[in-house]
Amino acid sequence: MEVHEEQVSAPVTGDATAKYLLQYILSARGICHENALILALMRLETDASTLNTEWSIQQWVDKLNDYINAINVKLNLLGYKIIRINHGIGRNAVTLKAKQNFESFEDNTAIRAHNNDYAVLQSIVLPESNRFFVYVNLASTEETKLATRFNQNEIEFMKWAIEQFMISGETIVEGPALETSIIVKEVNRILVAATGDSNLAKWRKFSTFTVGSTNLFQFQELTATDIEDLLLRLCELKWFYRTQEGKFGIDLRCIAELEEYLTSMYNLNTCQNCHKLAIQGVRCGNESCREENEETGENSLSQIWHVDCFKHYITHVSKNCDRCGSSLITEGVYVI
């Protein structure tokens, strides 16, 4: 997808605001953090001299959602849609990462408003948010969705790579997880807050739906150079992501486009709380938590939660797994 720099030079209102918001999402390769869109909307309202400095942040969120809904009315006719998807690593972790990467996600963001010809500096405190807006193809099959951007060999590589990610995620590794993992840090913080025990022993099990580049270079239908170039492009398009350790996994755009395909094709169990696909978060560590699928006879993976869903579950529901009864305080698995 061609990338266009955002240019807003004239006052905009109504349909024009919706148009610019759509352009902004497309300029971000079709996936945009909620706070970035709130800031873009504020900028548009400022240029149109319609910025209401008295609005709460929730009113801005509501107005953004109204515009997205209006955009979707027209996009649906073309076979596209902007969907809302929450990142599995949680609000706190996403916000921390966003602050590190983009100046626009600072807690106190200056928005210049015009009131009676005077410039008024209004400080806006953006919320913690793990919500992203993703521009997706509503085509009926995964092949059709991918064919608009990738050739057949590239599509076959993506399907093969995704299978490798899923196989990797089935394996629970015994031993300490990476202390540098933002998921490990966030889960440990949640456990301490839930128990009040700052000396709580860290879990010694983890799993990961990621695979190293060396393994991915084993694909036979493309050269190593082609695979390297494709991986870079997939990361740019937010289909895959690359970890600090050089491993690759599926990113939000891939989940948004192919969630139904992934859950059915690979017999993945969804988050116990929100029932959406979860490939980062927390899994029950008790082996007896695995259930046998009545249709296939295969054992499913144990219960899994997104980070925020896990926090809600152990805080408001139970500190024990509802399937096997084991303690989630001591018998958990980091899914990183």
Curated annotation (Swiss-Prot):
Reactions catalysed: S-ubiquitinyl-[E2 ubiquitin-conjugating enzyme]-L-cysteine + [acceptor protein]-L-lysine = [E2 ubiquitin-conjugating enzyme]-L-cysteine + N(6)-ubiquitinyl-[acceptor protein]-L-lysine
Q: Which UniProt keywords apply?
A: DNA damage, DNA recombination, DNA repair, Metal-binding, Nucleus, Transferase, Ubl conjugation pathway, Zinc, Zinc-finger
Q: What is its EC number?
A: 2.3.2.27
At the top level of its lineage, which domain of life is listed?
Eukaryota
Q: Which GO terms describe its molecular function?
A: ubiquitin-protein transferase activity; zinc ion binding
Q: Which InterPro entries match?
A: Nse1, Nse1_RING_C4HC3-type, WH-like_DNA-bd_sf
Q: Zn fingers (RING-type): where?
A: 268-327
Q: Where in the cell is it found?
A: Nucleus
Q: What class of enzyme is it?
A: transferase
Q: Which CDD domains match?
A: RING-CH-C4HC3_NSE1
Query: What is an example of a Pfam family matching this protein?
Result: zf-RING-like
One GO cellular component term noted in the UniProt record for this chain:
Smc5-Smc6 complex
Q: Does the keyword Cytoplasm apply?
A: no
Q: What's any GO biological process attached to this entry?
A: DNA repair
Q: What does this protein do?
A: Acts in a DNA repair pathway for removal of UV-induced DNA damage that is distinct from classical nucleotide excision repair and in repair of ionizing radiation damage. Functions in homologous recombination repair of DNA double strand breaks and in recovery of stalled replication forks.
Q: Which family does it belong to?
A: Belongs to the NSE1 family.
Quaternary state and interactors: Component of the Smc5-Smc6 complex which consists of KRE29, MMS21, NSE1, NSE3, NSE4, NSE5, SMC5 and SMC6. Interacts with SMC5 and SMC6. Interacts with NSE3.
Q: What is this protein called?
A: Non-structural maintenance of chromosomes element 1
Name of the gene encoding the protein in the UniProt record: NSE1
